[in-house]
Amino acid sequence: MLTGSITAIVTPFKNGEVDYGAFERLIEFQIQNGTDGILVCGTSGESPTLSYEEHEAVIEFAVKSAKKRIHIMAGTGANSTEEALRFTTFAKAVGADSALLVVPYYNKPTQEGLYRHFSKIAKEVDIDIYIYNIPSRTGIEISVDTLERLAKDHKNIKGSKESTPNMDRISEILKRIPNFTVFSGDDSLTLPMMSLGAKGVVSVISNVMPKEIKEFTSYALKGDFEKARDMHYYLLEIFKIMFIETNPIPVKTALSLMGMVKKEFRLPLCEMLPQNEEKLKEVLKKYNLI
C-alpha cells in the first residue's frame, strides 16, 4: 500500500522545452531524501500546458529515471474520457506504478457520468487508480456515494486525493469505504486528515523540503500526533507562502532560488509579482533553504 509523502513534482522548462537534465536531478533529490512517491504531470507539473507528446514523454522519463527506487504516480486525468484513457494506458505500458485521475473539469458531468468515466478507465487499464477530488479547480465534486460505488465495483480503484477542507467528507469516505486510501491534497490539511485516518499527502512543499514532509507523515502514520503536530506548526509558514499565488508559481520560483530549476513557466502561468517573490525569499531564508 502506498502511504506517506508523495511529491507533486514540478516540470522544469528551459528555453520553452522540458528540461530533462533538471528533471532528473529533481527526481534524485526526492529519492535521496526518502520521499515515498512522486506524482508527475499533476497540477504542480503544469500538465495543462504540456502537449500530448510531452505529457507522455515526461511520464516515461520519470519511470526510467526512478529505476524502481521510488513509486511513480502518473497524472493521467482529463475532462475527456478517451484522452484520460489514452494517458492511463500509456502510463501502464511504460511501467508507472499508479495513476492519478482528476475529476473531469469544466464540462460538469453528473455523478452517473463521473461513475462511467472512472469505471471505463478502471475496466480497461489494470493499474492502481487514485481519484483526484479538487472542486476549487474542477467546478464539481465527486460524491462519497460515487466513490463508494466505484471502489466496490473496481478493485484497482485504490483511493483518492482530497483537496478539500471538508473534514466531514473525509470522515464519511474513511468510515464507509473499506481499504480505501485517502491522501491529503493540501499540505496544510495533512495533519487533520491523517488524524482521521488518511495515509499521507500529495505534497507541494516536499519539492523543497522532502525530508521534513517525509518525517511529518511518518510521525502521523505511527500515531505520534504530538510530534506530527509540532512538525505541522514548524512548517505552517512555508505551507502558507507557497500558495501566496497560484500553484505551482511559488514552488517553482522557490526551486529556482535554490538553484535547482530555471524560473520559467508556460503561459498563462507567469512569474510572481516582485513583492510576493520578496516575501517568499524571506520565508525560504528562515528555513535555511537559500
Curated annotation (Swiss-Prot):
Pfam families: DHDPS (PF00701)
Gene3D superfamilies membership: Aldolase class I
Gene: dapA
Binding partners and assembly: Homotetramer; dimer of dimers.
Pathway involvement of the protein, from the record: Amino-acid biosynthesis; L-lysine biosynthesis via DAP pathway; (S)-tetrahydrodipicolinate from L-aspartate: step 3/4
Class in the EC hierarchy, top level: lyase
Catalysed reactions, as listed in the record: L-aspartate 4-semialdehyde + pyruvate = (2S,4S)-4-hydroxy-2,3,4,5-tetrahydrodipicolinate + H2O + H(+)
Keywords on record: Amino-acid biosynthesis, Cytoplasm, Diaminopimelate biosynthesis, Lyase, Lysine biosynthesis, Schiff base
Species, as recorded: Hydrogenobaculum sp. (strain Y04AAS1)
Record-annotated active site: 132, 161
GO molecular function: 4-hydroxy-tetrahydrodipicolinate synthase activity
Location relative to the cell: Cytoplasm
Protein name: 4-hydroxy-tetrahydrodipicolinate synthase
Cited InterPro entries: Aldolase_TIM, DapA, DapA-like, Schiff_base-form_aldolases_AS
